[in-house]
Amino acid sequence: MAHLLDVNILVAWGWRDHADHDRVVRWIAERKMAHGVKLFTSLIPEMGFVRVSVQRSSGRISVQQAAEVLQGMLKSLGKLHQFLPDDLGATEWPSWCGSAARTTDAHLLMLALRHGLVLATLDAGIPGAMLLT
């Protein structure tokens, strides 16, 4: 199975004080033990991780520090990780994307589907994505 990691997965994985940190750490550990698994990131989730990390109310850090944390996270995945270039424009949207708040979710879902991946997320409001439980 191949997953595109959503911003919220990266944020929860990266910060121990996040409410879903332990759940995401367990899920990633399970993926590391499985065969044939690939975990993808793309520009939007990586930039989202940096943006959210810099804006956190607890333990704010610099952009460079956030990038270093992200780099360490991705390096820890070894060969499981691949970067997925974003090759989608902004001209097609699924019918459920009716507001600005859903545009990133919709774009990432469409990107994942285009490349035969499953979007892994903590957001129950993304139809067709895999909700981490």
Identify the role of each PLM range.
Residues 30-31, 73, 111:
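Hydrophobic helix-cap positions at the C-terminus of alpha-helices
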Residues 41-46, 104:
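Short, conserved alpha-helical segments within structured domains
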